[in-house]
């Protein structure tokens, strides 16, 4: 019989077949051609023989009907439906590639959600630290040991949080504490194909082995196909052999524990689409790592701590913040985004990252950054490693940057010798992390309580819904409006500027004196000329057009635009209704130089309308540009005038140009300064305006500056005292109307130089002023605190519906202390004499009449209940702020 196409005997390879009873047999060996349709129909597809096992004959083409049906259905679809499906696939692809929520596209599908991009955050933060250390050493000419010190400080931070470089990072042989990663097996399809091929080859080998031992081998050879369609299921070979090459690279991976001398093998198990990896990493360490704070505020704290550990006494925290904003470290926008948590975490109710997510670009005033740095310093206990800051060195640096006379510096040092100042960067006198949560405790806290724990890191906690402004735990956490605590910490930078500001008021009559004409004495210091120079140099530092600044009459508008409701208020529409929300942290702060971070050196595309361009980058690496940027502006202006002389030839005012480059360091503050120094040591002769010194307006009462020590039950326990945002706002708001234009300009300018909010600088100024003007009162308060004697403070209890009643409180320390630095908690108790004094007061009747006039329908029982319900307690400003001045200065 002539062979048909593709017909070949698979036993002997012959091409000639004979038809016998409807079946084809090979003419050479007699093997049946592999077509079992009639055999399947007649005998049911199963042939039983006596041998080693059962012989199963497979069906071919069983799914042809289904395939034909599917093809018929697909051909019946219209072209519109086919195009719609193709368009949906294409739109899904582009939607997956699009950036959402200002985040980069990362493979979230293949990364477990519980990892929180941990590897990306740690790697990005470490790379930024390494780059910062390289720039400090190679470009800013710091010592080479700064780089390893920065990395060692970060290592200590990880060890403190029990994340890495510690024994708790490993779990040993306890499998319950191991971290088990459940991941998607991306190579499942490929492994499945390889497994099918392996089983197919194994069946062939088993079939050959069965044929060699079977008694009915001839029957099998003549009636079955032993290469593909023969499937033997023997009792001896029920268990499948595992692939020895599968996951060979993971089986030999071991981890050594140096302390316990235990060897922990990493188990990698793959079951279908799921890949289960049992690691030697502790689950607790991973949980702490994903909750630890990694942002630019911690970066500032690490850099400042490393520089002070290397012995640099003249570097302030404001300098490090300014270097980051000036793009000296070339931190890219991508690195900042990698340090942040992903958008998926922000959508969950247990998001612990709103503290970092609210402001990632360091747009904070200095006191906000100081708070995080203080938390870092006190948590790691770096006091032994850090060098002590020298007030004289720092004051000389600031006076040189401001181009002030040397005699002015001597007056600043004289004032500091009379009123000592604590310039320790740990700020133990203002805040103590032992009263709340440190970095290690924040990393170990539950996600639901993380935000409230961060708010109470120094023991402060908002008490009521309205006072907290959606800043409480549990229910309020779901709203995700938490920003931060309302505590203001006075940094050493702010205290130094407060001394300079007070010396100006004590030496010059900046409030009442008129603008004096130019003095003929070339060696006399003219404060009006110096203020003009300060204003022009600040404009030059802010990148204004100097051809406009140096004109005789040309107003230079401010670049910044104030928000409608204040600097720390946000306005938004909610369902058509306007909402004004007060932020706990002053995010979006722009009263600094530069006002925002610049990414010019790391951006892929140039910014066309960016006014923050870096002029003369080579000169920016000079020591004067790094440490005295305001004084360095004379070099910048001189370079610009040399580059484009035609621009400044006929426009610039000669007097303004002369004032801009004038040197005041050798000028005399007063005409008879040398005579005063030789003949007398009187305070009034050194400070001529001290005898007629006037105090600006101050509020009568201060509130929201106390909190209980108990976090879970805020109605019991002793109190802690602090400076709140509201107290600073009230203090500056009341005094602003009495400011003179000169003092207002000096306050804003000095705060602008260090990147501080003017209200924090004025609060430090008032504290220093109280030490000078109310020294007897503060000394009495100091002795009472050290001896644990009660201090009587006048108060007002504000109740519902504007009820308020005067009362008295006695403030005493919780425990006797030997020095003010050890003072933590206070006991505030009511006095029995309070009601008697109120009864004898001349205003008691008027107050009683006014309170009851508001609610005439109140019964006696209701009035008694209202009197016992106190909403707020305001303290007398002079006494309470005096306690804060003694404790914190």
Curated annotation (Swiss-Prot):
One of its GO terms (cellular component) is RNA polymerase I core factor complex. Zn(2+) binds at residues 9, 12, 26, 29. Residues 229-253 are annotated as: Disordered. InterPro entries: Rrn7_cyclin_C, TAF1B/Rrn7, TF_Rrn7_Zf. Residues 352-510 are annotated as: C-terminal cyclin fold. The keyword Manganese does not apply. Coiled coil: none annotated. Pfam families: Rrn7_cyclin_C, Zn_ribbon_RRN7. Keywords: DNA-binding, Metal-binding, Nucleus, Transcription, Transcription regulation, Zinc, Zinc-finger. Residues 102-113 are annotated as: B-linker. GO terms for biological process: nucleolar large rRNA transcription by RNA polymerase I; RNA polymerase I preinitiation complex assembly. Residues 35-101 are annotated as: B-reader. Although it shares weak sequence similarity with GTF2B/TFIIB, displays a similar subdomain organization as GTF2B/TFIIB, with a N-terminal zinc finger, a connecting region (composed of B-reader and B-linker regions), followed by 2 cyclin folds. Belongs to the RRN7/TAF1B family. This is TATA box-binding protein-associated factor RNA polymerase I subunit B.
């Amino acid at each position: 019989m002539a062979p048909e196409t593709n017909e070949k005997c698979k036993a002997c390879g012959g091409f000639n077949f004979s038809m016998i009873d409807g079946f084809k047999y090979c003419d050479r060996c007699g093997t049946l051609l592999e077509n079992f349709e009639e055999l399947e129909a007649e005998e049911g597809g199963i042939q039983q023989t006596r041998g080693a096992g059962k012989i199963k004959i497979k069906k071919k083409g069983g799914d042809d009907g289904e395939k034909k049906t599917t093809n018929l259905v697909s051909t019946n679809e219209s072209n519109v439906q086919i195009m719609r499906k193709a368009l949906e696939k294409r739109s899904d692809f582009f939607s997956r590639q699009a950036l959402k929520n200002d985040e980069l596209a990362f493979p979230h599908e293949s990364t477990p959600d519980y990892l929180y991009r941990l590897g990306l955050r740690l790697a990005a933060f470490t790379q930024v630290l390494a780059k910062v250390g390289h720039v400090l050493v190679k470009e800013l000419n710091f010592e080479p040991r700064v780089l390893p010190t920065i990395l060692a400080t970060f290592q200590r931070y990880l060890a403190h949080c029990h994340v890495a470089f510690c024994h708790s990072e490993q779990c040993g042989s306890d499998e319950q504490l191991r971290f088990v990663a459940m991941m998607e097996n991306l190579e499942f399809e490929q492994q499945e194909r390889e497994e099918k091929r392996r089983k197919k080859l194994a069946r062939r080998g088993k079939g050959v082995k069965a044929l060699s031992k079977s008694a009915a081998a001839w029957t099998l050879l003549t009636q079955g196909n032993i290469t593909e369609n023969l499937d033997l299921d023997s009792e001896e070979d029920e268990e499948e052999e595992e692939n020895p090459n599968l996951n060979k690279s993971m089986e030999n991976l071991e981890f050594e524990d140096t302390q316990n001398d235990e060897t922990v093998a990493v188990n990698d198990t793959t079951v279908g689409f799921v890949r289960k990896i049992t690691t030697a990493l502790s689950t607790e360490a991973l949980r702490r790592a994903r909750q630890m704070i990694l942002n630019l505020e911690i970066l500032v704290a690490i850099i400042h701590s490393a520089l002070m550990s290397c012995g640099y006494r003249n570097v302030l925290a404001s300098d490090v913040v300014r270097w980051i904003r000036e793009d000296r470290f070339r931190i890219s926008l991508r690195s900042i985004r990698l340090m942040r948590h992903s958008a998926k975490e922000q959508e969950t109710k247990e998001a612990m990252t709103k503290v970092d997510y609210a402001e990632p670009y360091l747009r904070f005033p200095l006191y906000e950054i100081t708070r995080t740095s203080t938390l870092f310093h006190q948590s790691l206990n770096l006091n032994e490693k850090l060098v002590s800051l020298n007030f004289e060195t720092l004051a000389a640096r600031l006076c040189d940057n401001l181009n002030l006379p040397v005699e002015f510096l001597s007056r600043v040092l004289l004032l500091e010798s009379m009123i000592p100042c604590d310039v320790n960067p740990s700020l133990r006198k203002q805040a103590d992390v032992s009263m709340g949560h440190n970095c290690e405790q924040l990393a170990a806290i539950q996600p639901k309580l993380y935000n409230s724990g961060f708010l109470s890191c120094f023991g402060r906690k908002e008490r009521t819904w309205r006072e907290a402004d959606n800043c409480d735990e549990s229910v309020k956490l779901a709203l995700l409006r938490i920003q931060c605590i309302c505590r203001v910490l006075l940094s050493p930078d702010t205290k130094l500027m407060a001394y300079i500001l007070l010396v100006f008021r004590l030496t010059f009559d900046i409030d009442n004196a008129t603008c004096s004409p130019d003095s003929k004495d070339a060696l006399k210091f003219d404060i009006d000329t110096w203020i003009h120079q300060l204003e022009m140099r600040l404009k030059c530092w802010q990148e204004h057009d100097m051809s406009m600044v140096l004109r005789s009459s040309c107003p230079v508008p401010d670049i910044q635009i104030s928000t409608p409701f204040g600097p720390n208020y946000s306005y938004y529409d909610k369902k058509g209704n306007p909402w004004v929300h007060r932020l706990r942290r002053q995010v979006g702060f722009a009263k600094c130089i530069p006002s925002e971070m610049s990414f010019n050196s790391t951006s892929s595309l140039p910014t066309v309308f960016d006014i923050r361009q870096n002029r003369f980058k080579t000169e920016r690496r000079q020591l004067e540009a790094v440490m005295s940027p305001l004084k360095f502006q004379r070099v910048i202006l001189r370079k610009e005038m040399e580059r484009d002389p035609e621009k400044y030839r006929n426009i610039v005012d000669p007097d303004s140009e002369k004032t801009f480059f004038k040197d005041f360091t050798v000028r005399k503050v007063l005409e008879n300064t040398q005579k005063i120094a030789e003949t007398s040591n009187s305070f009034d002769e050194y400070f001529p305006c001290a005898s007629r010194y006037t105090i600006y307006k101050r509020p009568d009462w201060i509130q929201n500056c106390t909190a209980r020590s108990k976090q879970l039950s805020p109605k019991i326990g002793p109190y802690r005292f602090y400076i709140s945002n509201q107290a600073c706002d009230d203090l500056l708001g009341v005094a602003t109307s009495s400011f003179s234009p000169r003092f207002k300009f000096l306050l804003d300018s000095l705060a602008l130089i260090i990147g501080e909010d003017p209200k924090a600088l004025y609060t430090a100024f008032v504290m220093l002023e109280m030490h000078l003007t109310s020294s007897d009162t503060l000394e009495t308060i100091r002795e009472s605190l050290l001896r644990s004697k009660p201090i009587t403070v006048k108060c007002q209890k504000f109740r519902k519906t504007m009820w308020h009643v005067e009362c008295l409180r006695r403030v005493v320390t919780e425990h006797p202390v030997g020095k003010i630095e050890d003072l933590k908690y206070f006991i505030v108790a009511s006095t029995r004499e309070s009601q008697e004094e109120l009864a004898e007061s001349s205003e008691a009747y008027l107050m009683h009449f006014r309170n009851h006039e508001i609610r005439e329908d109140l019964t006696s029982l209701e009035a008694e209940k209202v009197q016992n319900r106190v909403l707020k307690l305001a303290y007398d400003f002079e006494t309470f702020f005096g306690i804060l001045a003694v404790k914190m200065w």
